[in-house]
């Protein structure tokens, strides 16, 4: 089977590939890598690509029919999310003894939250549509990065200390995340 893919060249150092939710294959490559080398890279991973594309298409079947939010609905959801998330950030930062910078609420299609090296926190507005425990988990997860900017055992121990049932919350996001993010 001939594998179709798009190439994105940048100042990166390594080759990588990603299967997008719509089943398209994106190859990310350093500017100095030739198209022939990229072709060999794709060929060497063709079995994995075919299997992954099929899995992604089955998993995301029907997501294109999900009703997208309007700009107005997104603005309202962002305000609601901020009102729900800020008290949790304040509560857990105090409890965990960590500081943070600015807090942003965004409509992100791939992340539930993030923490920069400067301590700035970003949260997905879609968290407002999740159970409160899930929202608490994402807040604890991001604030734990204020002590551990990685996903080491120590990091996960800290998450578990403040959110003993974090695995359940994480599972909720794994099971429902694609459907929620399809609304953006």
Named regions from a protein language model:
Residues 142:
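Walker B catalytic acidic pair
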Residues 1-137, 146-184:
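Active-site-proximal or metal-binding-adjacent scaffold patches in catalytic folds
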């Amino acid at each position: 089977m001939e594998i179709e893919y798009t190439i994105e060249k940048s100042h990166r150092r390594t080759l990588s590939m990603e299967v997008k939710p719509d089943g398209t294959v994106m190859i990310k490559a350093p500017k100095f890598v030739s198209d022939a080398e990229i072709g060999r890279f794709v060929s060497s991973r063709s079995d994995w690509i075919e299997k992954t594309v099929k899995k992604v298409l089955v998993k995301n079947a029907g997501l294109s029919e999900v009703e997208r939010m309007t700009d107005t609905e997104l603005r309202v959801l962002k305000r609601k999310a901020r009102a729900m998330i800020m008290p949790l950030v304040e509560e857990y930062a105090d409890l965990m003894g960590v500081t943070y910078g600015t807090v942003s609420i965004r409509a992100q299609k791939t992340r539930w939250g993030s923490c920069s090296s400067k301590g700035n926190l970003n949260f997905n507005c879609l968290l407002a549509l999740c159970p409160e425990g899930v929202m608490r988990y994402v807040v604890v997860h991001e604030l734990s990065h204020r002590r551990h900017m990685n996903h080491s055992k120590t990091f996960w121990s800290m998450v578990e200390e403040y959110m003993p049932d974090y695995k359940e919350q994480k599972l909720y996001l794994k099971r429902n995340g694609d459907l929620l993010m399809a609304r953006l």
